[in-house]
């Protein structure tokens, strides 16, 4: 191809590209020199010159204006208004603080003050015949956490040959129930669930005398001291000893054991148990040492009238004074072994709302009965987890008697237990509030729990086998505490009353209760 031809081709390519540089909307007569995308704007010089340029006042001009009488008066007025407003707010805050009611100082509370304790006296009966002791218990910690219990009283589970003091080792786990490693693993797992482990160290639990024979007291005392120190080092949160009424010099030994636990940590608990229901004997044991928790058979007396229940509770509180109480119907055993079935729901409500620590045995949340089923051990029935729990007999187990069945029933005894345990652990009036019994109709036991400016709780228990309408009186309340005309329902032990839903407002002038029904009502603090 010639040189001229090459030049012509280049010109063609340039001519083809040139239209791309033209404006898309250019008119036919547009100047050829304009470029695509470039817009030139010509601003008239006279229009720019017409604009006013503001440069502000000079320093001298500002000082002159600011010093004028008008601006001086304005500044002083604004300054005076600011300080008057500030002083007014300060005075208002002082008045509010002075006139506001003083808050009561919260008492020091340990973990056992904040909820219920749950006893598992027979570990194998609790986990079932096919599970293995301590390892089986670990699998049920999730269930125990749903009960909102603060402590688990376990055992005894130590090595004990019946009536043989030298063959009893309080520092070793019974091999039939597990190993030391199993127990340490249980402690760690329970800690993650915020459940404290209390170990029952009643020495001769398989024998006739829980404390062996009187001449062997010194041997037992030495073993106890060694065991307490050893288990505390392993992380146990407390100890229980039962039948202290059968222990010679019980007051001396209890004081010594309490010192060992408290010297290790103030957050360690010692529980004593007695089969006695005599109030004076109970007080004598309590006076042996401070901060001792005592379970007894005091409430196992026939208290199946409201008047008798009120008398027993008030006598106990007066006798124990400012001591922290615990409430149970026995040192061991099920509620159903002491309380007729129709009173079980009432007693749950009673124990959870009295001032002190409620103590229950495994199965109390279900209404488990010691002799209800063929094949059940009389003193330690198997925990009924499901219909097949009682595998040692062919007799069927009713679903509504099991954990599985009651879990699914909003009106079950288990549901009531969980609700009460939850309230007991988070409401200040129930945690550490004052207790005042009320004047009420015959057959009723009613009382108020209150703390400072927190929500108040009214408990009304009908121990009669007939329904009644009652007026709850406030004549026994101290100054500054009064009852409203109505209160809101939190819980009724009668799950058949569908018309009484939580939050229903009930008149205290004419309060209707069914036979054996208990009510937990709530009303606010009013200054």
Swiss-Prot record:
Molecular function (Gene Ontology), one example: aromatic amino acid transmembrane transporter activity
Any stretches that span the bilayer, and where are they? 76-98
Residues modified to Phosphoserine: 2, 58, 300, 421
What are the Phosphothreonine sites (modified residues) in this protein? Answer: 5
Q: Output compositional bias ranges, type Basic and acidic residues.
A: 7-21
> What conditions trigger expression of this protein?
Expression induced in normal hepatic cells in the presence of actinomycin-D.
Q: Specify the glycosylation sites in chain numbering.
A: 166, 249, 259, 263, 318, 386, 400, 510
Q: Give the membrane topology.
A: Single-pass type II membrane protein
Processing and modification events after translation: Phosphorylation on Ser-300 and on Ser-421 by ecto-protein kinases favors heterotypic cell-cell interactions. N-glycosylated; N-glycosylation is crucial for trafficking and stability of SLC3A2 to the plasma membrane.
Q: Where is this cross-link: Glycyl lysine isopeptide (Lys-Gly) (interchain with G-Cter in ubiquitin)?
A: 42
Q: Which part of the chain holds the cross-link Glycyl lysine isopeptide (Lys-Gly) (interchain with G-Cter in SUMO2)?
A: 59
Q: Which GO terms describe its cellular component?
A: amino acid transport complex; anchoring junction; apical plasma membrane; apical pole of neuron; basal plasma membrane; basolateral plasma membrane; cell surface; lysosomal membrane
Q: Report which superkingdom the organism of origin falls in.
A: Eukaryota
- Family the entry assigns: Belongs to the SLC3A transporter family.
> According to its UniProt entry, what is the function of this protein?
Acts as a chaperone that facilitates biogenesis and trafficking of functional transporters heterodimers to the plasma membrane. Forms heterodimer with SLC7 family transporters (SLC7A5, SLC7A6, SLC7A7, SLC7A8, SLC7A10 and SLC7A11), a group of amino-acid antiporters. Heterodimers function as amino acids exchangers, the specificity of the substrate depending on the SLC7A subunit. Heterodimers formed by SLC3A2/SLC7A6 or SLC3A2/SLC7A7 mediate the uptake of dibasic amino acids.
Q: What is this protein called?
A: Amino acid transporter heavy chain SLC3A2
Gene name of this polypeptide: Slc3a2
